[in-house]
Design a protein with these regions (language model features):
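Surface-exposed molecular-recognition determinants
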Residues: 67-433
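Generic structural signal for beta-strand residues in well-ordered domains
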Residues: 15, 32-33, 47, 55, ...
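Hydrophobic residues embedded in beta-strands of well-ordered beta-sheets
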Residues: 46-47, 52-54, 62, 155, ...
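Short hydrophobic/aromatic-rich beta-strand motifs
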Residues: 23, 30-57, 100-105, 256-258, ...
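Assembly/interface hotspot detector across virion components, adhesins/toxins, and nucleic-acid enzymes
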Residues: 3, 10, 55-57, 147-148
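Extracellular/surface-exposed low-complexity repeats and stalk/linker segments enriched in Gly/Pro
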Residues: 4-47, 66, 74-89, 231-240, ...
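Tryptophan-rich substrate-binding surfaces of secreted polymer-degrading and adhesive proteins
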Residues: 58-68
């Protein structure tokens, strides 16, 4: 049995005037001469949860210990799951949490649209969206398949009546990407902006919010995971200029994806690293960035609000919209930009973690929205690409190769969609663990 010795002068637990070793005094302010590494309980201070504060001496001054928010585990908030279709009803497990947003794509059929479903709009045949089309929600779901339910460890898919099935064709291979937000709302908000929302309509970190609704447009439902920097917001447009609505996060979003769910509209995407706050991209096209002159997104984007104009892309009167908002979280997610060098030894993009999923888009010229993950390719180089803007099947080629490393990802190709010399690119990445 191992023993631990406590030696006087090295570890001093309760002698107010000693200046040696590790110190845990219980009196008031320590009056002796401090030494670096000492710890004290300063009863003249106060904290949010205690009448006294633990402090440490850094060699110059006494400093309070500060609680740090734990870094979210990637596997608790994002996961990729592969599955094979059965042309019926199928429960997909292994996600590791109950998703609030799941994005599905067939890997081996170029006629299959993407299928995006979230807990705010709900599941079922009337709620699917496709990132590669302008269609309203549910336009393709009943015929081509849909996600019918979220569960504690995944989701259920239902084949449609028409081939090809977007989510569950017999023997077809699929990839699913799932994110955790704040839980499924249990009600639709009927309160106006500035008022307390209908109970259960705004879910922040799994709890129904009682805070007043931010913005000039009252969100109808919100699901936000503040620790993971991801929220889902539904709202109804009013057709007016210079409007705002709350996003439910506690930091400024760095990537905002919006879709008119009532009608046929493009998918505008705002990113912090575009030319200006008025610029945006389209998720469903390969187009370069464009200037919306404030009619789409505008300077109203803040730590509580998303600012929009009167464009039909984001704010037609009486039309319904869905927004997916993201910001970087150290150790879990990173949203940023880089400049290509045109070499197969391309830029190394520091993320602070090993990526599990990366999406890249060139902004100054046409290119697809390229997606790589660590489940379709388990080792470097990662060469299997799906494109959010296309129904095309998975491409596997060294032309699209990138490496996932412990602290970054590196572009190891010179393709236009990844690494043209002088080209500007945005990316969003999520951690493996």
């Amino acid at each position: 049995m191992a023993l631990t010795k406590v030696i006087t002068g090295v570890t001093d637990l309760n002698q107010a005037q000693s200046t040696n070793g590790l110190k845990f005094p219980t009196g008031s302010v320590f009056a002796g001469t401090p030494e670096e590494g000492m710890i004290r309980n300063d009863q003249s201070q106060s904290s949010e949860t205690s009448s006294s504060t633990m402090q440490f001496y850094n060699g110059t001054a006494w400093k309070n210990f500060v609680n740090k928010t734990p870094i979210p585990l990637g596997s608790d908030n994002f996961n990729t799951v592969l599955y094979t279709g059965n042309n019926g009803t199928q429960s997909i497990t292994g996600v590791g949490f109950q998703p609030d947003f799941t994005w599905i794509k067939a890997r081996d059929n170029g006629s299959n649209n993407h299928a995006l479903t979230d807990s705010v709009r709900g599941t079922g045949s009337g709620n699917g969206l496709s990132s590669n089309t302008t269609g309203a929600e549910g336009q393709y779901s009943a015929a081509y398949g849909y996600l019918s339910a979220f569960s504690t460890d995944g989701f259920t898919v239902q084949a449609g009546s028409t081939s090809p099935n977007f989510v569950n064709s017999s023997s077809a291979n699929y990839v699913s990407w799932s994110w955790k937000a704040g839980g499924a709302p249990t009600a639709t908000n009927s309160a106006g902006a500035g008022n307390v929302p209908t109970s259960g309509s705004v879910m922040i970190d799994g709890v129904a919010s009682t805070a007043t609704l931010a913005g000039s447009i009252a969100a109808t439902e919100i699901s936000a995971n503040t620790a993971a920097g991801f929220s889902i917001v539904s709202y109804t447009g009013n057709g007016s200029t210079s409007q705002t609505y709350g996003h439910g996060l506690d930091s400024i979003p760095e990537m905002i994806i919006t879709k008119n769910t009532s009608g046929s509209e493009y998918w505008p995407v705002w990113n912090k690293d575009l030319t200006s706050v008025n610029y945006f991209l389209y998720l469903n096209t390969t187009d370069a960035e464009g200037d919306g002159v404030g009619t789409a997104f505008n300077s109203g984007i803040s730590s509580t609000l998303i600012g929009i104009g009167s464009s039909g892309l984001v704010n037609t009167s009486s039309q319904n919209y869905i927004t997916y908002a993201f910001h970087s979280v150290a150790g879990y997610s990173k949203i940023g930009s880089y400049t290509g060098n045109g070499s197969t030894t391309g830029p190394t993009i520091v993320t602070g973690f090993e990526p599990a999923w990366v999406m890249v888009k060139r902004t100054d010229n046409t290119s697809a929205w390229n997606i790589q993950d660590n489940k379709r390719n388990t080792t470097n180089p990662r060469t299997s690409v799906l494109q959010a803007s296309s129904s095309d099947q998975e491409y596997t080629s060294s032309t699209y190769a990138i490496n996932f490393n412990t602290n970054d990802f590196q572009i190891v190709n010179s393709d236009n969609g990844w690494n043209t010399s002088g080209g500007t690119y945005i990316y969003m990445a999520f951690a493996a663990t």
